Amino acid sequence: MGQKVHPNGIRLGIVKPWNATWFANTKDFADNLDGDFKVRQYLSKELANASLSRIVIERPAKSIRVTIHTARPGVVIGKKGEDVEKLRAAVAKIAGVPAQINIAEVRKPELDGQLVADSIASQLERRVMFRRAMKRAVQNAMRLGAKGIKVEVSGRLGGAEIARSEWYREGRVPLHTLRADIDYATSSAHTTYGVIGVKVWIFKGEILGGMPAATEAAEPKADKPKKQRKGRK
């Protein structure tokens, strides 16, 4: 059986940025990693209804900065910023350092892999037919400018006795092209028959030149003039 590498992991540093950017000494590394995990876990639970796309964590000078990418910023911020202040206090308590929270709005949720996967999962939990949910997600993504999209659901589809997988694809999804901007995400729907897994791949186009560090290395070096050896004419 052909095994597939994680589409986001293989593109890190090429066309995909990291979700956590910080440096730590050996003794602090495990604590920071554990703090990151607990912060993500807390925010995912608290903002379950806020259409959460991704959480980016930075740690500048003994503090923590969390950027929440969401399609519904109003739900996260709350009235006069009350909710975001509660989140800031909770994150500071979990991490043990002063916290700052930034909100970034996702303009096109139909082109965000995580939001599409969560949307399909929530529809399956509401007993919507899985083929209808898949086709609707694919059509919306293509209508808003995606170059290609693939959706796969697996489990006891439609309450069947034997679990199976079904997928639907439209357009191109070139997983082997490293410069391809592919947004991959997973989600799970907890139904009365069991858990149904959802996977989404969205191809948004190719990023030429890669990330800034890659472009600097790719610049051609000017040829140095060769020195003539002594005694030769």
Curated annotation (Swiss-Prot):
Organism: Vibrio cholerae serotype O1 (strain ATCC 39315 / El Tor Inaba N16961)
Family matches, as PROSITE patterns: KH_TYPE_2, RIBOSOMAL_S3
Annotated Gene3D superfamilies: 3.30.300.20, Ribosomal protein S3, C-terminal domain
Pfam families linked to this entry: KH_2, Ribosomal_S3_C
Name of the protein: Small ribosomal subunit protein uS3
Similarity comment: Belongs to the universal ribosomal protein uS3 family.
General function of this protein: Binds the lower part of the 30S subunit head. Binds mRNA in the 70S ribosome, positioning it for translation.
Gene Ontology biological process terms from the UniProt entry: translation
UniProt entry keywords in alphabetical sequence: Ribonucleoprotein, Ribosomal protein, RNA-binding, rRNA-binding
Family matches, as NCBIfam families: rpsC_bact (TIGR01009)
HAMAP family found in the cross-reference section: Ribosomal_uS3_B
MF term (GO), any: structural constituent of ribosome
InterPro entries: KH_dom, KH_dom-like_a/b, KH_dom_type_2, KH_sf_prok-type, Ribosomal_S3_C_sf, Ribosomal_uS3_bac-typ, Ribosomal_uS3_C, Ribosomal_uS3_CS
The organism's place on the tree of life at top rank: Bacteria
Domain KH type-2: 39-107
GO cellular component: cytosolic small ribosomal subunit
Subunit structure: Part of the 30S ribosomal subunit. Forms a tight complex with proteins S10 and S14.
